[in-house]
Amino acid sequence: MQLRQASVLPRLSPTNAECRPGELLHIIGPNGAGKSTLLARAAGLLAGEGEVYLAGTPLSQYTAADLAVRRAYLAQQQPPLALMPVFQYWQRHQPPLAQEYAVEKVVHFLAERLMLTDKLARPLTQLSGGEWQRVRLVAALLQIWPTINPHARLLLLDEPTNSLDVAQQVALDSLLSELCRLGIAVVVCAHDLNHSAHHADRVWLLSAGVLVAQGETEDVMLPEVLSPVFGVAFQRHVVDGRNWIITRSA
């Protein structure tokens, strides 16, 4: 995916950036920085100036159906309005023309990994917040899982760990790593700086709608880069060989 002067004024200034196949990229920044706007623009869901390219083709040249085959998008919030059961909701997200037995295999795999195997018949409106978040994650993953969708290229997730407990976050991290190994680019709007420091391959840092830094994680997740943007004095500590970003004591 490439962004070429892509903007949604005044929320997102013209932006040039790219995410490579098989890369896990995190978008970070303070609240109101434009992270969700950038993700929705990259998904083709917000109009604006400039262009977003996917697999070398401008999003504007894809039909809605063609785009849905190539990328999946998880919004930060989405109420479960339908009365349908979980398995039917997932059916609506499976790739067209996929072999039914192959889809069933992936559904079982994803449901097991995200601890939902006992929820398939439950109506969406009877799910807890964490269950609904995991159901939505399975739907997004199912839409672009490469073994059943050879056209898949990109997964866009806005705050995917909302309402997840620690074990569920670990399970999601493992699935995203596996998806990247299969060649899918994954872009995540994130709020936990240490999680980004430990898991992202590359990071985009936004401030007031401007992409102020982008690059390898170790080059962006530095106190001197983060502190001016967040307005907090950060320092870096190394514990058991891992870098941790913490606030400086008063």
Swiss-Prot record:
Domain ABC transporter: 3-233
UniProt GO MF annotations: ABC-type vitamin B12 transporter activity; ATP binding; ATP hydrolysis activity
PROSITE patterns, per database record: ABC_TRANSPORTER_1 (PS00211), ABC_TRANSPORTER_2 (PS50893)
Keywords: ATP-binding, Cell inner membrane, Cell membrane, Membrane, Nucleotide-binding, Translocase, Transport
Subcellular location: Cell inner membrane
Superkingdom of origin organism: Bacteria
Matches recorded under SUPFAM superfamilies: P-loop containing nucleoside triphosphate hydrolases (SSF52540)
Any single Pfam family the record assigns to this protein: ABC_tran
Binding site residues for ATP: G29, P30, N31, G32, A33, G34, K35, S36
The reaction(s) this protein catalyses: an R-cob(III)alamin(out) + ATP + H2O = an R-cob(III)alamin(in) + ADP + phosphate + H(+)
Gene Ontology annotations for the cellular component aspect, listed alphabetically: plasma membrane
Physiological role: Part of the ABC transporter complex BtuCDF involved in vitamin B12 import. Responsible for energy coupling to the transport system.
Family of the protein in this entry: Belongs to the ABC transporter superfamily. Vitamin B12 importer (TC 3.A.1.13.1) family.
Record's subunit section: The complex is composed of two ATP-binding proteins (BtuD), two transmembrane proteins (BtuC) and a solute-binding protein (BtuF).
Protein's recorded name: Vitamin B12 import ATP-binding protein BtuD
Organism for this UniProt entry: Pectobacterium atrosepticum (strain SCRI 1043 / ATCC BAA-672)
Gene of this entry: btuD
